[in-house]
C-alpha cells in the first residue's frame, strides 16, 4: 500500500511538472519581444522618422509580438559606440552613416567615394539593386545584418571665417570629419587638416575655434545648429554617403527565421518614408539657414575639387572595390 502511494505521488508530481513546463513554453511564445534601436540624431530628424516607421512596421507585421524602442539623440552613445554595441549584441539595431561603419567593413568605401554618383536617381538605382544588396549582405562578416539604406543627401563644407570657392581656400583649415580613413584622406587631399571628433562636440569646437569648419548636409547643418557658429556654407557636394540601418547578428540569431524575415521586410518598407522625409526636411533646412543670414555660395569649379580627390580611388580602394566602383558607374 505504501509503495502504491509513493508511485501515485510521483505520478502526480511528474504530471504537474509537465503542465508547468507546457505553461512556461506557452508564456515564452506569447511574450512580447522588446528590441532597442539607437540613433544619434534628434527626434524630428529624417533618419529617426525612418527608424520610427521601421518600428511601427515591425510591430504591425508581428501582430504586436515584437516591439522596437527607438532611442534618438545619442541616448545610447555616439555612432561609433553604437556600432560596437550592436556588433556585440548590447544594442539590437542602429542607424548610422556608412562612413564610420567602413572602419568595420572597409569595402563600404566603394559606396561613398567623392563624386561617384551622377545624381540621387543614380544613387538609389545602385543602393536598391544588386550592388546595394551585396554590400548589405557583406555586413555579416563583421557580425551585423544589413537591413536597408536611408538617404543623407550630399555633403558640402561649412566654415566659420570665410567661404570656400577654390581648393586653395581650404588650405590649412582644420575641418571636422567623421572617424573614417576615407574622410580624413578626402579633406587632406584638398590641403585642409582633417580633425576627427564625435558629432556632439562639433558645435563647441566651431564656437571656440578648435576647428575652422566641418562638412555635412543641409539637415545636419540646421538640426545641429552649426549654422549659428559657422555662417559660410559652400556647396561642393563632394560626396553622397548613404545611411544604413543595421541589426546585431547576435540578436537576430535568437529569433526565428520568420521573425528575421519580417524585420527585413519592415526595414525595406520604411525606406520610402525616410527618403520623402529627407527631401522635405532638406528643403526646409536650406530655407531656414538662408533666412538666418548664412552666406551660401557654390564653388567655382567642381572639376577642380574632383581632380584633387581623384587619387583617393587608388589609395583607398582595393582592386576588388575598384571593380565595384566601375559597376556603380555603369548603372544607368
Annotate each predicted stretch with a short phrase.
Residues 1-34:
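Short, low-complexity disordered leader/linker segments with a strong preference
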Residues 23-122, 131, 139-332:
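N-terminal secretory/targeting leader peptides
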Residues 136:
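Conserved glycine-rich "GG(E/T)P / GGGxP" loop and the immediately following alpha-helix
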Amino acid at each position: 500500500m505504501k509503495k502504491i502511494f509513493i508511485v501515485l505521488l510521483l505520478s502526480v508530481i511528474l504530471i504537474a511538472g509537465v503542465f508547468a513546463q507546457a505553461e512556461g513554453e506557452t508564456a515564452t511564445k506569447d511574450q512580447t519581444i522588446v528590441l532597442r534601436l539607437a540613433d544619434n540624431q534628434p527626434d524630428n530628424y529624417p533618419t529617426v522618422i525612418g527608424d520610427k516607421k521601421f518600428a511601427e512596421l515591425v510591430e504591425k507585421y508581428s501582430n504586436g509580438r515584437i516591439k522596437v524602442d527607438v532611442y534618438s539623440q545619442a541616448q545610447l552613445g555616439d555612432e561609433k559606440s553604437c556600432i560596437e554595441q550592436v556588433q556585440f549584441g548590447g544594442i539590437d539595431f542602429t542607424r548610422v552613416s556608412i562612413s564610420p561603419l567602413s572602419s568595420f567593413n572597409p569595402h563600404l568605401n566603394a559606396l561613398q567615394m567623392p563624386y561617384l554618383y551622377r545624381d540621387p536617381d543614380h544613387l538609389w538605382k545602385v543602393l536598391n539593386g544588386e550592388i546595394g544588396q551585396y554590400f548589405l549582405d557583406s555586413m555579416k562578416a563583421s557580425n551585423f545584418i544589413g537591413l536597408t539604406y536611408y538617404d543623407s543627401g550630399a555633403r558640402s563644407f561649412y566654415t566659420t571665417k570665410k567661404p570656400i570657392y577654390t581648393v586653395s581656400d581650404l588650405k590649412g583649415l582644420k575641418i571636422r570629419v567623421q572617424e573614417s580613413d576615407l574622410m580624413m584622406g578626402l579633406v587632406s587631399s584638398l590641403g585642409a587638416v582633417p580633425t576627427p571628433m564625435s558629432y556632439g562636440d562639433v558645435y563647441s569646437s566651431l564656437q571656440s575655434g578648435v576647428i575652422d569648419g566641418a562638412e555635412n548636409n543641409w539637415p545636419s547643418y540646421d538640426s545641429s545648429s552649426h549654422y549659428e557658429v559657422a555662417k559660410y556654407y559652400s556647396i561642393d557636394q563632394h560626396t553622397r554617403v548613404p545611411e544604413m540601418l543595421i541589426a546585431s547578428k547576435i540578436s537576430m540569431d535568437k529569433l526565428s527565421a520568420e521573425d528575421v524575415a519580417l524585420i527585413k521586410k519592415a526595414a525595406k518598407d520604411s525606406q520610402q518614408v525616410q527618403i520623402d522625409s529627407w527631401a522635405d526636411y532638406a528643403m526646409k533646412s536650406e530655407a531656414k539657414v538662408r533666412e538666418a543670414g548664412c552666406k551660401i555660395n557654390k564653388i567655382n569649379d567642381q572639376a577642380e575639387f574632383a581632380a584633387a580627390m581623384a587619387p583617393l580611388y587608388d589609395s583607398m580602394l582595393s582592386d576588388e572595390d575598384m571593380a565595384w566602383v566601375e559597376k556603380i558607374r555603369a548603372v544607368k
